[in-house]
């Protein structure tokens, strides 16, 4: 399978000299929406400039809430904020906002003091949702926030329901409800459920996107490799709908080698919610492909941290190609594309 790294493999969103985004711009979520006059007007208001005439945005708009690590003038707390970038459906960067659009709460007991981390993006009922791990320097809990204009946000820290009561990460919801409920992929640890410390992907559900979210059980765990000391899995991009209740899922596999070098690669599977049986949620997973894409470039390797990373955060299909954004080397955001039919042929769906 031939995967093309966009922009010659270079970063699509790189750190800048702005102090709030100077230390890293990795793991950036996004959502692609059809271009409408209302949406183009909305992003133009958010940008403070007219984007309605940009020919690259006439069919679809990709709205990215990117990771931005650094400090703000007058605030010496190094943390992770969210910046705003607008891409074309081919992942051409069309606009990048000069200031963060979402920042942590800096009160002493804040859940997200040290970071709004690994934020996936979805859109429903006229609202943009981001699903992120709120990190306070000691523990990370699942959170979300929503906005109608990409500038003003309402936070729910932590998620409502049992899933928000314990440490949890890499959570993202499916794009629409199925059989009267909303569904979520999540990965808890330190949780009062069997084998949670093995970092497995589990299924959650709720009556609304606002919760209350409950756990439905394990659906996917890492595959043991003889050359790795430990392996695990975690969520990636928001699932892509391919049929009623059936989704293409791009997730990540992580591992430590025996000399403690860390490795992340992109993987794929299919999830069919039609097959969900309470108490047997693993029946929904099939057609697993590991790896789908592995680190291979300088951008995807970070020798200072002894880590190589491809961390998928967004995916969409446009003009017969699967496009996706990923965190590269724990440094910045990259993009890639691959023939969608080839993916379907290899995964046999």
Please report, for each region that a protein language model flagged, where it lies by residue.
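Short glycine-rich, acidic/polar surface loops and turns
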Residues: 299-302, 310-314
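Beta-rich carbohydrate-recognition and catalytic domains
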Residues: 1-114, 122-168, 176-231, 241-305, ...
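Beta-rich, blade/repeat-based domains predominating
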Residues: 119-120, 171-174, 236-238, 311-317
